[in-house]
Amino acid sequence: MAAAAPNAGGSAPETAGSAEAPLQYSLLLQYLVGDKRQPRLLEPGSLGGIPSPAKSEEQKMIEKAMESCAFKAALACVGGFVLGGAFGVFTAGIDTNVGFDPKDPYRTPTAKEVLKDMGQRGMSYAKNFAIVGAMFSCTECLIESYRGTSDWKNSVISGCITGGAIGFRAGLKAGAIGCGGFAAFSAAIDYYLR
């Protein structure tokens, strides 16, 4: 920086120090991402845009139906069925024992037998994934509605309920292990996604 010329009064030149005003860029950053940031009001009418019209009764009814626990559970059931079916067909495709007959180990299975086995495994996985998805989604929605908050505790509690219900078919110990395992998995997924 070039040397500053002395003032007319003969006093020493002012040095650039902490008394200097912050840069405009720093002020802008404080308002955009810093502690002076404020929530935006994104109403198009106040910004000079076209204001959005009020929602009709049909729109409100559709939104209410899509936010219901029954719709969320049905959506998770269908998604779980599709994902489980794809996963079952994939695992059957890489399994070397698909279509294998233990009575005649040297016989090569036909394409029809392999496809039948893949379909059976795909359907089995699809049903299991659909049930787990529907149970988890429904319990999480009900817990969220009951508690009135949307946080990580909802998924942990619903994971424990779902895992416990699935594991309880094999006994009390399996139910407790299923509860803990599914709750831990739900917490890990929720932590990763949020």
Swiss-Prot record:
Belongs to the Tim17/Tim22/Tim23 family. Its main location: mitochondrion. Disulfide bonds promote efficient assembly of the TIM22 complex. It is a multi-pass membrane protein. The gene is TIMM22. PANTHER family: MITOCHONDRIAL IMPORT INNER MEMBRANE TRANSLOCASE SUBUNIT TIM22 (PTHR14110:SF0). One of its GO terms (molecular function) is protein transmembrane transporter activity. Disulfide bonds join 69-141, 160-179. It is found in: Mitochondrion inner membrane. The lineage of its organism: Eukaryota, Metazoa, Chordata, Craniata, Vertebrata. This is Mitochondrial import inner membrane translocase subunit Tim22. The chain crosses the membrane at residues 74-94, 123-143, 170-190. GO terms for biological process: protein insertion into mitochondrial inner membrane. It is linked to Combined oxidative phosphorylation deficiency 43: An autosomal recessive mitochondrial disorder characterized by onset at birth, intrauterine growth retardation, hypotonia, myopathy, feeding difficulties associated with gastroesophageal reflux, and persistently elevated serum lactate and creatine kinase. Brain imaging shows delayed myelination. Muscle biopsy shows decreased activities of mitochondrial respiratory chain complexes I, III, and IV. Keywords: Disease variant, Disulfide bond, Membrane, Mitochondrion, Mitochondrion inner membrane, Primary mitochondrial disease, Protein transport, Translocation, Transmembrane, Transmembrane helix, Transport. Essential core component of the TIM22 complex, a complex that mediates the import and insertion of multi-pass transmembrane proteins into the mitochondrial inner membrane. In the TIM22 complex, it constitutes the voltage-activated and signal-gated channel. Forms a twin-pore translocase that uses the membrane potential as external driving force in 2 voltage-dependent steps. GO terms for cellular component: mitochondrial inner membrane; mitochondrion; TIM22 mitochondrial import inner membrane insertion complex.
